[in-house]
């Protein structure tokens, strides 16, 4: 990755070469000398890619002086490198410090809110929590150039927290993004945590500058040295007795609190202010995976030092990289950005979700002799069976339903409602089965998957038979999401404008799924056509306002076991949609329920989902926000 545009400015190019030749004279005039003595081409310096073996060509000390020369259309990394203009938030780390892909630069509103909550921890509003646990005021101590957390990690001056910031024109931007007074640059003292305000190329000097010294407390000057802050291990002596310090003599065992891992020996002997081991043990903060990788819309692949590691571990060391791909049944228009565990034990960005790919089906169908179509599960992959256990030996079939998200089912309220108590049945008496080909609970196929129910939500106005099944609609949240496949997919929903909500129009060609009443009760779908509420009233004068009806076509029937199932229709998608094919959409839920082994020969009453937009969308949004 070379930025040959600098060649278009010969005066800049000659001046830059002269500076490099003056300060790094060991290499020839067309080369840059790395800190380890290696020589690389001048054109490979400050281009976002580490070309020196030690990476010294991509540091703030080397690159911060080039900032004024990096203008649009190029993108300027926080430490000063100049890279391709599309680098910002394209999912690829073009900058050596990752400043083009930080969470605060690229994250959505949810990512930023989550980041702010974690940064605040249990501190007050407008404060942030250091790794050591102390709370500091954001406006005074965050990204001010100083290591105010004083733990040696520069946490409050990190690129992740400060790299996205814009500094005022009168100030100087440090190599990690913090802002200091412009008068402090090149004053002979390091006022930026990374020393970038005294960079040799910026200040035209080669002498070492002084760094303010943090005076250690007298306690730490006595006895064997120990790390400060959260890096300090838990010290125990004989009999697991916790030691405080100073440690002047004796054998000490080291351990760390949860979330930290010990680097160094587990025990050492202290004498004459020195440990018997060559390195001082310290605790390193690892990145927690709690809530980071979880989500049914993506799958994660974790690596550390180039080796694949188990993502399910509760903590990962700094340097761990996580790649994501969309789960089956989900998609994205651009590659998902990677996550990295940073020094200090935090992730550089949040996980990005994929979009649900609903309403898709596959495989041909064959005609069923009675007028319905016996089908492969892929033809109605959103259709599920609802089974109940009421003081019996096993579950028995109750109703059908439709999958809205991997963990949310829509069905009829009367399927889960106790007319005697006027309350829903207990959620733990139900079980949902997806990809169910045979209706009987005990007749299974390898494709079917089972989930328990953890929450039942019934439409607030539902009163059962007393109100003639008005608002006959319920949502079931599952204890665990289904893993989507070619036989398990959610149905699409869309909601019309206010004026169009009152009724489904006439003659919408669609179908509903159920299990036939013959032989093994195999899965089938029934073709049908819709009729508006006003047309339905000619046959059913007491039909409620939230209903429409469908007429089954041919000899096909709607039977008792079809209650709760969905009437769906294939529709073309919007030309501006990210979908490029027709999709199947849910129009209504079967409400009327003939007696067992009876079927409706004429019309079937449906609950129109358009009357429940808030209820449905709120539940779907909860699923996406908490579990996708």
Curated annotation (Swiss-Prot):
Observed effect of gene inactivation: No visible phenotype. Viable but highly susceptible to septic injury with Gram-positive bacteria and fungi. Adults infected with Gram-positive bacteria E.faecalis and L.monocytogenes rapidly succumb to infection, and display reduced expression of the antimicrobial peptide gene Drs in response to septic injury with the Gram-positive bacteria M.luteus and E.faecalis and also after injection with their purified peptidoglycans.
Keyword presence, Secreted: yes
Domain Peptidase S1: 369-621
Disulfide cross-links: 27-39, 34-52, 46-63, 70-82, 77-95, 89-106, 123-135, 130-149, 143-162, 167-179, 174-192, 186-203, 224-270, 256-283, 302-341, 326-354, 399-415
Gene Ontology biological process: defense response to fungus; defense response to Gram-positive bacterium; innate immune response; positive regulation of melanization defense response; proteolysis; receptor guanylyl cyclase signaling pathway; Toll receptor ligand protein activation cascade
Glycosylation sites: 36, 204, 376, 621
Its EC number(s): 3.4.21.-
Limits of the LDL-receptor class A domain: 26-64, 69-107, 122-163, 166-204
Cited PROSITE patterns: LDLRA_1, LDLRA_2, SUSHI, TRYPSIN_DOM, TRYPSIN_HIS
Pfam families xrefs: Ldl_recept_a, Sushi, Trypsin
Annotated signal sequence range: 1-25
SMART domains, per the entry: CCP (SM00032), LDLa (SM00192), Tryp_SPc (SM00020)
Location of the Sushi domain: 222-285, 300-356
Catalytic residues (UniProt): 414, 472, 563
Family named by the database record: Belongs to the peptidase S1 family.
Protein name (database record): Modular serine protease
Organism taxonomic ancestry: Eukaryota, Metazoa, Ecdysozoa, Arthropoda, Hexapoda
